[in-house]
Amino acid sequence: GVYEVENGITVRELIELAGGIRGGETLKAIAFSGPSGGFTPAILPRGAWPRKIQRLLPANIEQVNILDLQMHINYFRLWDLMLGAGIVVYAQDADLVDQALACLRFYQTESCGKCVPCRIGSTKLAEIGGELAEGRLTRSELEELATETGPITELASTMASTAICGLGTVAPNPLMTLLRFFPEEVRRYARP
């Protein structure tokens, strides 16, 4: 649906306004800007917070329930979260590997092909997502992909700094956030 609400409404209030999560299930993840922003987990552990937020909030707060976050562009900027376009809510039974692959394939087909970083990069991301979903990657290969200096981060950085348009900067986000925030879900797809 389409909802127009005041700045500052919480994520929980918006989801309730939209009818809640299907079947009364609990929230697993949310994409605040559609696939462009990637997947934000329902519970955001302190280690995943931007440093500026870690300094602002008391040390005894170990995690934040994303449902309690106020939806205001300035707050989202502080949290390094995107806000805009469509918001997608994923219930506990959602397969985020499947969802990430669908997003990666979407970006691959949406690339106009004019710039090489986006054309090649979005294709490579979709290939990696396909290998993950088909169970062709080992645990060690998946761990390498998830590192801050791994090939996904390097590819994302190259795409962001050399792509002609914004598509190249956001195309890696579904896979990057999947690997960062949902390692247990990714491991279920690992080849023994």
Residue ranges and their predicted role:
Residues G1-P192:
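Redox cofactor-anchoring modules in respiratory/redox and cofactor-processing assemblies
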